[in-house]
Curated annotation (Swiss-Prot):
UniProt domain F-box: residue ranges: 205-251
Domain free text: The hemerythrin-like region acts as an oxygen and iron sensor by binding oxygen through a diiron metal-center. In absence of oxygen and iron, the protein is ubiquitinated and degraded.
Cofactors (names): [2Fe-2S] cluster
Disulphide bridges, residue numbers: none
Gene Ontology MF annotations: iron ion binding; iron-sulfur cluster binding
Gene name for this UniProt entry: fbxl5
Classification lineage: Eukaryota, Metazoa, Chordata, Craniata, Vertebrata
Subcellular locations according to the entry: Cytoplasm, Perinuclear region; Nucleus
Post-translational events: Ubiquitinated upon iron and oxygen depletion, leading to its degradation by the proteasome. Ubiquitination is regulated by the hemerythrin-like region that acts as an oxygen and iron sensor.
Cross-referenced SUPFAM superfamilies: F-box domain, RNI-like
Start-end of each LRR repeat: 343-367, 368-395, 396-421, 582-612, 613-640, 641-666
GO biological process terms, semicolon-separated: intracellular iron ion homeostasis; protein ubiquitination; SCF-dependent proteasomal ubiquitin-dependent protein catabolic process
Residues at which Fe(3+) 2 binds: E58, E61, H80, H126, E130
Name of the protein: F-box/LRR-repeat protein 5
Length: 696
């Protein structure tokens, strides 16, 4: 029995195997007829395999035991050599290679016996020394758990040798042996002694199927998508391996269908394609759409160019269908980027299936495709595209504000949870401190507010169906400098014994008596002041207030729900702290001044291009500015968006504090934000994108 607990005894198990091998070659040494050439060569082959195992055993001990011990104790140095294993292997190989005649065999046998006896007398005491000297030192310098881990690693390395022996020759032929040594640094030994016939057969032939999974996967990384698909058809094991997620991080179906098998990260995002190349792809799509695959008429006389275009489009469609049906269900969660730019066959249904199968996308390019709003139905739930950083929808002319609303929802919500936490903190503080003064006034006695005061007016609901007639409407007038949440105000009234009116809507009043539009969950009454821009333009009584759409340029509010950045229009002014409405919950909250930059990946969009999406309006831009805005957005291209206005641009830009003016593009006819530093319209004289000046 070992003198140490078996769980932490790192030497006894492997040494038992080594001692067993010593006994086997000593027994064969006494039984081998060295006059017989077959027996002689069989014994030498057996010795080669045995001493390779000895050498690998020593290498494992050096790396996983002695090396670690030397790091803990400076008393251990230069104590573990290979015990002349390399010299013995050279002796065996020389015998197999050079000894031919019977006399040479007999002379060699005498030398071999002497060398083996000398090695045995040295090797057995060496193992005993490790068990009696090094094991106690390990117990002294390592914890019990550390020793358990060391033993597991040692056993695992010994157990992995057999398949490595078979794979060695294949790897050397592929010039990958050095890389394999770095990955494993150990061969696997046989659990049972191999027969001479097995050893001779093993030295003569190897097969790639014997490679470890890790090495096969390393080889597969050098293959293109077409070759990977071919490998997946070899056998079921390779089929599973070819569908490893790390092999399919970046997908380029359009390029692959045309023979370009690039599979690295996406190219330069600012590089526009050549117009001739775009035209050729458009011609392909046109030819494919005009071609009827079910036509009864012989179309064999079609031009060669049309035939090539149709063939390319057919390959693309077949490739897309194959990916959706066979590949993405297995690897979709690992896919990070999909580029479908200028695809002539992709449909909204295909895109919808792709997005539902690839929830962790960071890069999506649908430039100049024929998709509609329904393609993004899978983003209609909160946090559906949480990781998305790059979205290129340039030239997708059928997209409307509905897509942007889905995108805003899928990117997540920065405001909701934070606002809830802030309200809890405020309630605790309010219960400990005296409330701010609140005056209850009759509506008829309310005077217009002056330039020096900003107020919020909370109106009582005039009455419900079937209820008794109400007294004249009363309102709360709160000083903006001490303004708090509506829930806090209700709490104060409860503590003071004042009945709380049933609040259903609120009005924000700006300096000079200008008002904001009425915001409410259900239909209510508009205020007696001027109505909002959007209610005037589109009659949207239920539209949530975007503040800047109905406020003057000097006091436009921001809807940024995450970071402390000054609005473009309020930069340099010392206005009062405004309270805005959380876009998701419909409750009131303070505009948080000390909220930190989101680090959990929510609303992480950095690149957004809507170039040529002429159906997008300010409503879509406002949807993006809600739920915390786009705090990380750096690139925004709205070239060719003909229906957006200065108001909508300001709404979105105020929610994008990281926006780089050099990468901010919009129509030159709009007097929008950052007019002096933004880059203007990119679609001027562009032959394949919408532009208001395309007729010039």
């Amino acid at each position: 029995m070992a003198p140490f607990p078996d769980e932490v005894d790192v030497f006894t198990g492997p040494h038992w195997r080594m001692k067993q091998l010593v006994g086997l070659y000593c027994e064969k040494l006494s039984q081998t007829n060295f006059s017989n050439n077959n027996d002689f060569r069989s014994f030498l082959q057996s010795l080669c395999a045995t001493f390779k195992e000895f050498k690998m055993h020593e290498q494992i001990e050096n790396e996983y035991i002695i090396g670690l011990l030397q790091q803990r104790s400076c008393n251990v140095y230069n104590v573990h050599s290979d015990n002349k294993l390399s010299e013995m292997l050279s002796l065996f190989e020389k015998g197999l290679r050079s000894v031919k005649s019977e006399n040479e065999q007999l002379n060699y046998a005498q030398q071999l016996k002497e060398r083996l006896e000398a090695f045995t007398q040295d090797f057995l005491p060496h193992m005993k020394e490790e068990e009696e000297v090094f094991q106690p030192m390990l117990m002294q310098y390592f914890t019990y758990e550390e020793l358990k881990d060391i033993k597991k690693q040692v056993i695992a390395q010994h157990s992995s040798q057999q398949r490595w022996d078979c794979a060695a020759e294949v790897l050397k032929g592929l010039s990958l042996w050095s890389q394999a040594e770095e990955l494993h640094k150990a061969f696997k030994y046989a659990d049972h002694e191999k027969t001479d016939d097995e050893l001779e057969k093993e030295l003569c032939s190897t097969h790639i199927s014997q490679l470890p999974t890790e090495i096969l996967l390393c080889l597969f990384r050098y293959l293109g998508p077409e070759d990977l698909c071919h490998c997946g058809q070899v056998c079921s094991a390779w089929s599973d391996l070819a569908k490893t997620g790390s092999l399919w991080r970046h997908l380029y179906p359009v390029r692959w269908a045309r023979g370009d098998y690039y599979r690295g990260p996406p190219d330069d995002v600012n590089q526009e394609p050549d117009e001739e190349w775009v035209k050729s792809l458009q011609d392909e799509g046109k030819a494919y759409q005009e071609w009827d695959e079910d036509a009864d008429v012989d179309e064999s006389d079609a031009s060669c160019e049309d035939s090539l275009a149709i063939s390319a489009a057919q390959r693309e469609k077949k490739l897309l269908n194959g990916m959706i049906q066979n590949l993405l269900p297995a690897v979709g969660s690992s896919v990070r980027s999909i580029v479908l730019a200028y695809s002539s066959t992709v449909s909204s249904k295909m895109v919808r299936q792709i997005l539902s199968l690839c929830p962790n996308l960071t890069h999506l390019d649908l430039t100049q495709t024929d998709v509609t709003d329904s393609a993004f139905d899978s983003w209609s739930s909160l946090w559906a595209c949480l990781s998305l950083e790059h979205l290129d929808l340039s030239g997708c002319e059928k997209l409307t504000d509905r897509t942007l609303k889905k995108l805003s929802l899928g990117l997540g919500d920065l405001a909701s949870p934070t606002c809830s936490e802030k309200r809890s903190d405020r309630r605790a503080k309010l219960l400990k401190s005296p409330p701010s003064p609140i005056s209850l006034l009759d509506k008829r006695s309310l005077r217009p507010t002056g330039h020096s005061r900003q107020v919020l007016i909370f109106k009582q609901w005039p009455g419900k169906l079937g209820s008794a007639p109400c007294s004249p409407t009363r309102v709360w007038v709160l000083d903006a400098s001490e303004l708090a949440d509506i829930e806090d105000a209700a709490e104060w009234n409860r503590r003071r014994g004042v009945s709380t009116p049933e609040v259903r809507g609120f009005v924000e009043t700006q300096p000079g008596g200008l008002s904001c539009c009425c915001r409410r969950r259900r239909g209510g009454f508009r205020t007696g002041f001027s109505t909002s821009y959007w209610q005037q333009q589109y009659g949207l009584g239920e539209a949530g207030c975007g503040h800047s759409t109905c406020c003057t340029g000097e006091t436009a509010l921001r809807t940024l729900g995450g970071l402390q950045y000054e609005s473009y229009t309020t930069r340099g002014s010392a206005g009062a702290e405004f309270r805005t409405k959380c876009s998701s919950g419909g409750q009131l909250c303070l505009e948080c001044d000390n909220r930190t930059d989101p680090s959990d990946g929510r609303r992480s969009l950095r690149f957004l291009s809507l170039s040529g999406c002429y159906q997008v309006t300010d409503l879509g831009l406002r949807a993006l500015s809600q739920r915390g805005g786009l705090p990380l957005l750096e690139h925004l291209n709205l070239s060719g968006c003909l229906l957006i206005t200065e108001v909508g641009l300001q709404e979105l830009v105020s929610a994008c504090p990281a926006l780089n003016d050099e990468h901010f593009y919009y129509c030159d006819n709009i007097n929008g934000p950052h007019a002096d530093t933004a880059s203007g319209c990119q679609n001027l004289q562009c032959g394949f994108r919408v532009c208001c000046r395309s007729g010039e």
